[in-house]
């Protein structure tokens, strides 16, 4: 790769590579590695590597792993334009919701379960839907159906990650939901900022155009759990990414 007649020593990659690798990039001089592009990764694979790490650390500190990682499963080969695929996906979602309800009853969690239905590939936030029953998937409007099926790079989605919805407990003084975003350097949680979305509730997808971002310096109150639970989870996730990378 030549830039203005020179070969760069280092390239910071700000492209999720959903559409495929970029010609001329050498993994040795690029971070993050182009090998980790979404053209060959799946969200479910990350959780497959993360879950054993969560289980190990949970045993060490004496808590149930569910407190650190939500439940999920993958529904594959679902062309939602076909009624049979929509019916099958709805049935799978209802079975999963029933499983979550049983767990909540056992643990004394006083709320009804919610699940996210999302593309198993890529980072695009448009095709994420929150549902509380399989019937909602059967009654989708054409517009919502197209959103759910649309992937970044105009690729249709056929593999869906069905993920337990976890309420966002962090709030601003005005009551807007807040979620942390962590930067890591050499595997250590090093810096934080926070996504705030006044147009969403505690169970909604905060990654939408109505979101704005607040640095930890602007509101130090958000940092209450930064150096313990948030740091622990982000560093475990980075370890899982390392295992993903090694497996590619």
Where are each of the predicted segments found?
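A general structural signal for short secondary-structure boundary/capping elements
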Residues: 56-61, 76-77, 81, 162-163, ...
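Short acidic loop-to-beta-strand element that houses the catalytic metal-binding Asp/Glu
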Residues: 2-4, 180-183, 237
């Amino acid at each position: 790769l030549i830039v203005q007649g020179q070969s760069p020593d280092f390239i910071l990659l700000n492209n999720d590579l959903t559409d495929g690798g970029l010609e001329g990039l050498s993994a040795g001089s690029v971070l993050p590695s182009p090998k980790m592009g979404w053209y060959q990764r799946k969200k479910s694979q990350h959780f497959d590597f993360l879950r054993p790490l969560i289980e190990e650390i949970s045993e060490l500190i004496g808590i149930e792993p569910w407190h650190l990682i939500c439940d999920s499963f993958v529904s594959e080969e679902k062309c939602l334009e076909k009624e049979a695929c929509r019916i099958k996906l709805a049935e799978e979602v209802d079975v999963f919701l029933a499983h979550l309800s049983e767990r909540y009853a056992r643990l004394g969690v006083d709320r009804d379960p919610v699940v996210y239905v999302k593309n198993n590939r890529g980072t695009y936030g448009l095709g994420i839907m929150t549902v509380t029953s399989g019937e909602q998937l059967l009654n989708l409007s054409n517009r919502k159906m197209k959103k759910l099926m649309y992937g970044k790079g105009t690729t249709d989605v056929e593999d869906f990650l069905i993920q337990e919805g976890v309420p966002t407990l962090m709030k601003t003084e005005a009551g807007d939901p807040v979620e942390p975003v962590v930067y890591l350097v050499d595997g250590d949680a090093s810096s934080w900022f926070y996504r705030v979305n006044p147009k969403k509730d505690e169970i909604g997808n905060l990654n939408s155009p109505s979101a704005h971002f607040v640095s930890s310096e602007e509101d130090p109150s958000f940092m209450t759990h930064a150096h313990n639970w948030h740091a622990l989870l982000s560093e475990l996730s980075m370890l899982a990414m390392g295992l993903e990378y090694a497996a590619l």
